[in-house]
């Protein structure tokens, strides 16, 4: 079998099918018939016969992305090797402060309601929390325990 140059036919078929040349499919069994086609009309006839067809558009699979998203939802892919931004870029210092101070104030209110601390102590601890003295709620509770001794 000799190799035929079907670039003209491919170009004409692409024009008729209104697609790119890469999406034009030729039936391997009818390459001789295709080689004889020289006009767009010849190409149209071959398309009607089903010898020339337009291939479907190739999509890009989202399987890998979906799998990665599922892993992230499970809390994976968060180790040191996966981090790009600085610590402050991933969770801004202000946002961390807001979360911490809200938790501390909630814990303080609860302690006051339960009678663990009186009004005066509550106010002192509230100000200390505002000043950034406590790292966490656990740190605050340790401080209160030591204060009682």
UniProtKB/Swiss-Prot annotation:
Keywords assigned: Ribonucleoprotein, Ribosomal protein, RNA-binding, rRNA-binding
Superkingdom of the source species: Archaea
Organism: Archaeoglobus fulgidus (strain ATCC 49558 / DSM 4304 / JCM 9628 / NBRC 100126 / VC-16)
Pfam families in the cross-refs: Ribosomal_L19e, Ribosomal_L19e_C
Protein family (similarity comment): Belongs to the eukaryotic ribosomal protein eL19 family.
CDD domains: Ribosomal_L19e (cd00481)
InterPro entries per the UniProt record, alphabetical: 60S_ribosomal_eL19_sf, Ribosomal_eL19, Ribosomal_eL19_CS, Ribosomal_eL19_dom, Ribosomal_eL19_dom1
Signal sequence range: none
Lineage of origin: Archaea, Methanobacteriati, Methanobacteriota, Archaeoglobi, Archaeoglobales
Name assigned to this protein: Large ribosomal subunit protein eL19
SUPFAM superfamilies: Ribosomal protein L19 (L19e)
Subunit structure comment from the entry: Part of the 50S ribosomal subunit.
GO molecular function: large ribosomal subunit rRNA binding; structural constituent of ribosome
């Amino acid at each position: 079998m000799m190799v035929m140059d079907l670039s003209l036919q491919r170009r004409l078929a692409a024009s008729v099918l209104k697609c790119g040349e890469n999406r034009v499919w030729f039936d391997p069994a009818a390459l001789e018939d295709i080689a004889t086609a020289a006009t767009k009309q010849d190409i149209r006839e071959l398309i009607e016969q089903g010898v020339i067809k337009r291939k479907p558009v190739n999509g890009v699979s989202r399987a890998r992305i979906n799998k990665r998203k599922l892993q992230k939802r499970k809390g994976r892919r968060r180790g040191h090797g996966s981090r790009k931004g600085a610590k402050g870029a991933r969770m801004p210092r202000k946002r961390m402060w807001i979360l911490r101070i809200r938790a501390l104030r909630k814990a303080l209110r609860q302690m006051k309601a339960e009678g663990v601390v009186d009004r005066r102590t509550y106010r002192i601890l509230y100000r200390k929390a505002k000043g950034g003295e406590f790292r966490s709620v656990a740190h605050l509770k340790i401080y209160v325990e030591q204060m009682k001794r």
